[in-house]
A protein has these predicted regions:
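Family-specific signature for flavin-dependent thymidylate synthase
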Residues: 1-202
Length: 205
């Protein structure tokens, strides 16, 4: 393959699409930094989150007191969101009807306007769904950065699952994929996790 000779551009013609759900808006902010990709994300503007779901970090899950405080906060956020959406919808509906718009049409428009502003109180833990398409070269870069032990836990777990899906499909492309320490020295220097041997045992070389 040309990629064996140091030419990576040919693998840009191979693309992979992933359906991703049950991840937080925190992860969304990180994954969209990878610019050579296409994203379709569940809208909080047009979809009212009556069924408020959220991601609980493992470190919070592991400490009962922290978990209780986190769950209470999520319940409060959910109620504030729904209360605010309701107040905004009622206010917008009254204004639009006062301007002569029929009630059914006014309420439909008011609902969208309410969702647009009510979402500002939603936490980063709020779940979202997305479809992501990346070419193979971008995926190699993504795996190098996000499979690293120093990557944030949620996006690292996602990267590992994505790698597990694409490797069986195209092992000739992804045989050297993974964190940078798979194919060379760790680039983190003093910040190295010190678990290179463990990483190498988990990632196919």
């Amino acid at each position: 393959m040309l990629s064996d000779l140091g030419h990576a551009s040919p693998i840009e013609h191979a693309s992979f699409t992933f359906g991703i759900e049950g991840v937080s808006r925190t992860l969304l902010a990180q994954i969209t930094r990878h610019r050579i990709a296409s994203f379709s994300v569940q809208s909080q503007r047009y979809v009212r989150l009556d069924d408020f779901r959220y991601v609980t970090p493992p470190e919070i899950e592991a400490i009962p007191e922290a978990k209780a405080a986190f769950l209470a906060s999520m319940e409060e956020d959910a109620q504030r969101y729904l209360d605010l959406a309701h107040k905004l919808e009622e206010g917008h509906t009254a204004r639009l009807m006062g301007e002569g718009m029929p009630e059914k049409q006014a309420r439909a428009k008011a609902s969208k306007q309410a969702n647009e502003d009510a979402r500002f109180v939603l936490p980063n833990a709020c779940e979202t769904k997305m479809v992501v398409t990346m070419n193979a070269r971008s995926l190699m870069n993504f795996f190098q950065l996000r499979c690293c032990n120093r990557a944030q836990w949620e996006i690292r777990e996602l990267a590992e699952k994505m790698f597990a899906l694409v490797y069986p499909v195209a092992p000739h492309i992804f045989r050297t994929a993974g964190p940078a320490c798979v194919s060379g020295p760790c680039p983190e220097g003093k910040m190295c996790c010190g678990r290179t041997t463990e990483v190498l045992s988990l990632i196919h070389i």
